[in-house]
A protein has these predicted regions:
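Fe(II)/2-oxoglutarate oxygenase catalytic core
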Residues: 1-150
Length: 150
């Protein structure tokens, strides 16, 4: 069985990666503490992170960088799995994005799955069929993402 995980190295240039990190660090008033579950609870024993939520419909250069990388990758993914365009009902990429930072010692410490999305989200996250991530660092010694069933 295929694992359905699509990996694409260097999907964002180093210059654009630096822009995204600079944006994150320069906007502390937009920082949120990482929450868990569709009820968005703070549970430090489960997750500790800093996050910013973005909506690509509020056009700025940062959103354009991420949206372009993500939508191009989705198109490549659909070529590998063409049933996504023919065997399922109409679907779309949600315009809400989350940028997360985990400092050393922080993380999402429990197994979890993508769930109902963010509060007030117009597209129901409960109907989510795919999730995507872009990593902006090379940290491998003390951080990782595990997909236990893949």
């Amino acid at each position: 069985m295929r694992d359905f995980i699509f990996r694409k190295k260097n999907v964002v240039s180093q210059e654009d990666c630096d822009k995204i990190i600079d944006f994150f660090e320069s906007n502390p008033n937009s920082h949120l503490q990482g929450t868990v579950g569709s009820e968005e609870k703070l549970v430090p024993s489960d997750k500790i992170s800093t996050e910013i939520l973005l909506n690509v419909t509020h056009c700025n250069s940062l959103n354009e960088i991420i949206w372009k990388a993500m939508t191009q990758s989705v198109e490549e993914y659909k070529k590998i799995f063409p049933f996504l365009d023919s065997g399922v009902r109409r679907w779309e990429v949600n315009t809400i994005m989350k940028i997360q930072r985990y400092k050393p010692g922080e993380g999402y410490f429990v197994e979890h799955c993508e769930n109902a999305g963010f509060s007030g989200e117009s597209v129901g996250g409960d109907k989510r069929m795919m999730a995507w991530m872009i990593y902006f660092n090379e940290e491998r010694d003390s951080g990782y993402t595990e997909f236990p069933t893949q």
